Design a protein with these regions (language model features):
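The catalytic Nudix box helix
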Residues: 18-51, 74
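Generic C-terminal helix-cap and adjacent flexible tail
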Residues: 117-124
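NUDIX/MutT-family hydrolases
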Residues: 73-75, 84-116
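Active-site-adjacent beta-strand/loop module that shapes the phosphate/pyrophosphate-binding cleft
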Residues: 54-82
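A short beta-loop-beta micro-motif enriched in histidine and acidic residues
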Residues: 11, 65-67, 88-89
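N-terminal strand-loop-strand
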Residues: 1-17, 45, 49, 76-78
């Protein structure tokens, strides 16, 4: 299963996706990930290895870059199953991999989730 959040803000407002956010000045990537997951889901996690690195560029109606994110996806382990959505998420759910289509998760996110599944299978 995988943890999904329904985005409260743009980009992708209302869409189900993996938890994440912005790195604050002076913050390490691992610390930013742990903080964002805690803020969005109420979960404390053990940050594991990098699964994938993806560029996300979104253009406005005039063809100008509106958003450009470099997304680094990690495999994490949660210390508990109890979740509660925070201020950046409308909802948070544990979702079986077989049910991802019900949540209209993007193809890129599904690909990352599949990579994470394989990586987790090979971890002690």
């Amino acid at each position: 299963r995988v943890l999904l959040v329904r985005r409260r803000h743009e980009p992708l407002k209302g869409a189900w996706s993996l938890p994440g956010g912005v790195v604050e000045v002076g913050e390490t990537l691992d610390a930013a990930l742990a903080r964002e997951v805690l803020e969005e889901t109420g979960l404390s996690v053990e940050v594991g290895p990098v699964v994938d690195v993806v560029d996300r560029v979104q253009f406005d109606a005039d063809g100008r870059v509106e958003y450009h994110y470099v997304i680094i996806d990690y495999l994490c382990r949660a210390w508990t199953d109890r979740i509660a959505h925070g201020s950046d998420a409308d909802a948070v759910r544990w979702v079986a991999l077989a049910d991802l289509a019900v949540y209209c998760v993007s193809g890129k996110a599904v690909a990352v989730i599949q990579k994470a599944k394989e990586l987790a299978r090979n971890r002690p």
